[in-house]
């Protein structure tokens, strides 16, 4: 690949990310903002959308997320469970797991999905 190919690939990925970000719900934007305020880095919008798509395609009823304060992914996976099932969030930081619980509590009026939050310090 030459320099032009790399530049075109970067532009394509930028377009995909911007498109995924523009489609985020208010709950996702709020989760991203809360995480930023706490200093928890989040994955890309496209990555979270891909997880949502995969969970829907597999008709998942139970999913596990492992990471440090992966709030955006949690919101996407709760949506992918269509208000049912169980989400297990394993987090290495106490701050991340506390924020996950708080965020999930805010969603509890709109979903029957259950949360199992586990703090696993490294």
Regions from the PLM with identified roles:
Residues 1-25:
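N-terminal auxiliary segments of SAM/dcSAM-dependent transferases
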Residues 21-23, 36-50, 56:
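Conserved SAM-binding loop and adjacent beta-strand
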């Amino acid at each position: 690949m030459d320099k032009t190919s790399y530049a075109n690939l970067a532009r394509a990925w930028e377009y995909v990310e911007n498109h995924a970000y523009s489609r985020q719900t208010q709950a996702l934007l709020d989760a991203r903002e809360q995480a930023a305020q706490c200093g928890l880095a989040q994955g890309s919008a496209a990555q979270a959308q891909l997880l949502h798509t995969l969970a829907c395609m597999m008709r998942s009823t139970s999913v596990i997320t492992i990471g440090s304060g992966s709030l955006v992914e949690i919101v996407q996976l709760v949506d992918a469970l269509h208000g049912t099932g169980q989400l297990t969030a394993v987090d290495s930081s106490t701050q991340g797991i506390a924020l996950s619980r708080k965020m999930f509590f805010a969603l509890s009026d709109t979903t029957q999905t259950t949360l199992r939050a586990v703090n696993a310090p490294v």
